[in-house]
Amino acid sequence: MAAAEEGCGVGVEDDRELEELLESALDDFDKAKPSPEHAPTISAPDASGPQKRAPGDTAKDALFASQEKFFQELFDSELASQATAEFEKAMKELAEEEPHLVEQFQKLSEAAGRVGSDASSQQEFTSCLKETLSGLAKNATELQNSGMSEEELMKAMEGLGMDEGDGEASILPIMQSIMQNLLSKDVLYPSLKEITEKYPEWLQSHQDSTPPEQFEKYQQQHSVMVKICEQFEAETPTDSEATQRARFEAMLDLMQQLQALGHPPKELAGEMPPGLNFDLDALNLSGPPGANGEQCLIM
């Protein structure tokens, strides 16, 4: 009888230990799952509380979590494998829809790998990346709160060579925020205005030494630059959203015209500020910004 009671006690103790083990495993699983506050995202935090994540946010999370080591730091081994598989799947789908965008992130990864152990270079790369992501998050949030529809964004971005598609439409707000930063008055106007003022004298002094076809392109280029400056000069703090959108579309069109005409004369392009150098190819207006370079575009 005593043996039976002892066996029963052992069984109860085993059940209790099993229950505690299961509860511990569940607790560990819950701890392994990233909360919205710690999830790898470039979206700006919302003080009003957790909200449903947009498809674009999920895509951004997957794109920037580009190494398995990153997943290992956030999850246990099993969840890391699952996250890695999901990332690879997302990248394969993206590669079919936006090969240039995939190339951009591959170059970013390669650039990070070349930083090395030098403290100053690491700090510079980290600072550039942090400021870029912060700028994207801020502008993406502002665009989402502005009430602009995806149809309006598509119209504004159709000059970038981005055809409508499920995967591409979700990143349009980010792409537009990048272009708005690049085409802002603070970035372009001072140098463009200076070049525009010096262009007539350069054209006059180089007409005989410049091939006629190239000289005509320079004349057209000067004309387009004048129009761009006029667009900037027409800006006012009281412009409506409709006016701002119309001006942005006009600026995209003018910048594409400028890109088609090639680079300005080196003597004039040298007036551009360091880091910009009027490299229109680096802006890559016919595709996702940054696809042709590793430069930090938003500072």
Curated annotation (Swiss-Prot):
Region called Necessary for PEX19 function on peroxisome biogenesis, residue ranges: 2-91
Subcellular location: Cytoplasm; Peroxisome membrane
GO cellular component, one term: cytosol
Start and end residues of each stretch annotated as Disordered: 1-61
Keyword set includes Ion transport: no
Prosegment residue ranges: 297-299
Primary localisation category: cytoplasm
GO terms classed as biological process: chaperone-mediated protein folding; peroxisome fission; protein import into peroxisome membrane; protein stabilization; protein targeting to peroxisome
S-farnesyl cysteine-type lipidated residues: 296
Residue ranges, annotated region (Docking to the peroxisome membrane and binding to PEX3): 2-56
Residues modified to Phosphoserine: 35, 66
InterPro entries, A to Z: Pex19, Pex19_C_sf
Amino acid composition bias (Acidic residues), ranges on this chain: 12-27
Keyword line: Acetylation, Cytoplasm, Lipoprotein, Membrane, Methylation, Peroxisome, Peroxisome biogenesis, Phosphoprotein, Prenylation
Residues modified as Cysteine methyl ester: 296
One Gene Ontology term of the molecular function aspect: ATPase binding
Pfam families given in the database record: Pex19
Role noted for this protein: Necessary for early peroxisomal biogenesis. Acts both as a cytosolic chaperone and as an import receptor for peroxisomal membrane proteins (PMPs). Binds and stabilizes newly synthesized PMPs in the cytoplasm by interacting with their hydrophobic membrane-spanning domains, and targets them to the peroxisome membrane by binding to the integral membrane protein PEX3. Excludes CDKN2A from the nucleus and prevents its interaction with MDM2, which results in active degradation of TP53.
Record protein name field: Peroxisomal biogenesis factor 19
